């Protein structure tokens, strides 16, 4: 029912009284608000300070992440302030908690610069996270409207084109990170790359913190790595690649390194999340213009994504990175050494791979999301995985993933090439069993043992790592599940 002119006038006069009034009364709380298709939606987990009403805390989050300050300002009247105010429109208690609330907040699309992750995040995760009225605050999910998505280029290459370039279909990509990640000379580094690729991997990669240190400058690494790639291609007849980490102190230096990688014939470059949103978008634009695959290492994300009550959920980073234009992003393994609840990981992968997301509360997906034809991002599973887990990896993660066995390749007792061969044989045996309709999850260990009868490197790997697991309960688990999930 619409308000009368008198009622609207009364509210307006009350709202613009001088001084400090509650955010909820300033217009940042509207339980009757009708969400528009063009609104940017955000879901925050709000933990109010003791004595602070959850509705007021949610309204404060809406206000401080949009147009509000601590007191009424008359200059609001010079703007379309009723339109530009973010509106908290629903507040729900978080299941199984006594002091946490889900705040649903809508933002008008005109509050954000087109095609700018930096501007979007300056509002959504800006000053509001230091606001005293909340004890803790976490951004759990967002819905990005199609009208805003269309201002971003999306992944530079995308999964489908990458498969065509690599000529790899019907199975996950196989890769490995060079180990040790720091300290090798350029020549030894190149040898590791060659052995891994010749043994059967599709990719080798730099790790997040190998840039241009005194023990090996970047140009030396690039030259030896590409020599290794070319020799491995000649030896195997397969398309291969090495992720060249072009992360550097300045954009000018990153451009120089990326251009050199291109001149050497590399099909892929790599950057780290820590370079920042603007730099990531800038390199994604460069990658698309230069027909390069862009790999993103999520270095630094757990400083703000791992804890359940403060920071932001990694699924939000997945959405921002798909908008920014990366082709790969590390997104968890479930069974490896890094944080990863099975349901949460599935939600991350779906966010990166699906063209349309439905609400799925067990996976932590709170909003329907149409991806507006933005290309798919290939998830990367890396960190503490080995060939003995191949049936679990294929079951949890599916085909569209890069499985990276760093220590699980280079730590093989018979050498790097043997480690790579063990992983390739294990993967192909498991994919074949799946394609034949076998219950490859239940039969997985036996499938691997059978494959190892004709592959000595696989048998050695299974003997070495058969008992290695990382069974820790995840800190970030779903709020809407019947039973707890374990990292097994």
Swiss-Prot record:
Q: Where along the sequence do coiled-coil regions lie?
A: none
- What miscellaneous comment appears in this entry? The basic functional RuBisCO is composed of a large chain homodimer in a 'head-to-tail' conformation. In form I RuBisCO this homodimer is arranged in a barrel-like tetramer with the small subunits forming a tetrameric 'cap' on each end of the 'barrel'.
Q: What protein is this chain from?
A: Ribulose bisphosphate carboxylase large chain
| Provenance organism | Gracilaria tenuistipitata var. liui (Red alga)
User: Partners and quaternary state?
Assistant: Heterohexadecamer of 8 large chains and 8 small chains.
Residue positions annotated to bind Mg(2+) are 205, 207-208
Q: What does this protein do?
A: RuBisCO catalyzes two reactions: the carboxylation of D-ribulose 1,5-bisphosphate, the primary event in carbon dioxide fixation, as well as the oxidative fragmentation of the pentose substrate in the photorespiration process. Both reactions occur simultaneously and in competition at the same active site.
Q: Which residues carry this modification: N6-carboxylysine?
A: 205
Q: Which Pfam families does the record cross-reference, listed alphabetically? A: RuBisCO_large, RuBisCO_large_N
Cysteine-cysteine disulfides: none
Q: Which domain of life is it from?
A: Eukaryota
Keyword Disulfide bond present in the record's keywords: the answer is: no
HAMAP family to which the protein is assigned, alphabetical: RuBisCO_L_type1
